Regions:
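Predominantly soluble domains enriched in secretory-pathway, periplasmic, or organellar proteins
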Residues: 1-173
Length: 173
């Protein structure tokens, strides 16, 4: 499937692919070292303590409609097997590891479910919504998360806001 995202840890690159596959590549000799098959259209990926956290974004149903998933897979990086599935907000896309936690953005369903910045505690496997109406994130300097919120009012007027979220303090600037 179409490669989507990549994360490198130690001697391996982990690549998510549409069609429900994660490929484990040995970066020393560029050989395929393992494969996980599951889900549908996989996007963001991050490694934390030997576990891969992978966003299972959406499925296309029999009528060619997009159905947004609410899943982050936890995959054992050594064996490339599914350990568990964590429920998150619809349409998860990007994941980052900061200060021992996993942070992710979900895009929502573009109708009645808004995008959200969320965290996953790797120790408990639970997810929590931090902020709603967040549409894009990236990790930045000083372990800050840079956020964009793009929302529309009842007349379809776009409003953009840019801010940072500090995972250590919870401060929004």
């Amino acid at each position: 499937g179409d490669p989507r995202c990549i994360d490198v840890e130690d001697d391996f690159a982990y690549v998510t692919q549409y069609g429900g596959q994660v490929s484990k590549l040995n970066i020393k000799d560029m050989t395929l070292a393992g494969t996980f098959k599951g889900g549908d259209n996989l996007e963001g990926i991050v490694e934390k303590d030997g576990k891969l956290y992978v966003a299972n974004t959406y499925t296309v149903d029999g009528s060619n409609n997009w159905v947004y998933n609410k899943e982050v897979f936890v995959i054992d990086a050594k064996t490339m097997t599914l350990e568990k599935t964590i429920t998150v907000v619809d349409n998860p896309t990007k994941l980052y590891e900061i200060d021992g936690k996993i942070y992710l953005i979900s895009q929502g369903n573009y109708a009645d479910v808004a995008g959200a910045l969320q965290s996953i505690d790797p120790k408990t496997g639970t997810s929590k919504v931090i902020l709603n109406d967040v549409t894009k994130i990236t990790e930045g300097n000083n372990d800050l998360i840079y956020c964009i919120s793009a929302t529309y009012d009842a007349n379809w007027q776009l409003s953009n806001s840019f801010f940072t979220y500090n995972p250590s303090t919870g401060a929004i600037n």
